Amino acid sequence: IERANQIAQTTELSANLAKGVKLIDARNKTDFAAGFIPGSINIQGNNAFATWAGWFLTYEEPFMIVASENQIEDLTRKLMRIGLDKVVGFVDNVTEWAAATGQQLETGKVISMDDLNELKQQNNLQLVDLRGAAEYNAGHIKGAEHVFVGTIEKNLDKVSKDRRVVILCQGGDRAAIAYSVLAKHGYHN
């Protein structure tokens, strides 16, 4: 873990990404949507961080984390408590990485309920509800497909690549995770 407490240099990050090392972006969903490294998964560094990381990481695979320097110790501790200790480094500035490599950051769009109501008027729209089964069964938007966020990678076949897709949950955190997973798998609709 001593090695993991170091901020990765641009070349180290690029080399790890080329080797397939997963990149977990722990920034808040708004900062993530404004610009993120392609292929990264947004799991916000809040109280649910370790829970969601446990759904998307295995105990064997190395990974890196995008986070501010003051979050590193806390996030590392949370992950170690559930056995995820293969952190190989941290990244604190995605903009510097993009500038140094010449690569473009991807962006996402956060929409409001008003935006959603407007989009629902379109025929070419798929709604994907990411909440748990009990939440979904207690009430959901008519026509929304249920795909629990923790299983989104195993259920990509349920998400259209041809239609416009709106993913939703209760507060947006799970939608940010699912958005990043979908973007990683080539969904840009």
Over which residues does each language-model region extend?
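Rhodanese-like catalytic fold shared by cysteine-dependent sulfurtransferases
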Residues: 1-2, 29-126, 130-189
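C-terminal accessory/connector segments of nucleic-acid motor ATPases
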Residues: 1-19, 24, 28-32
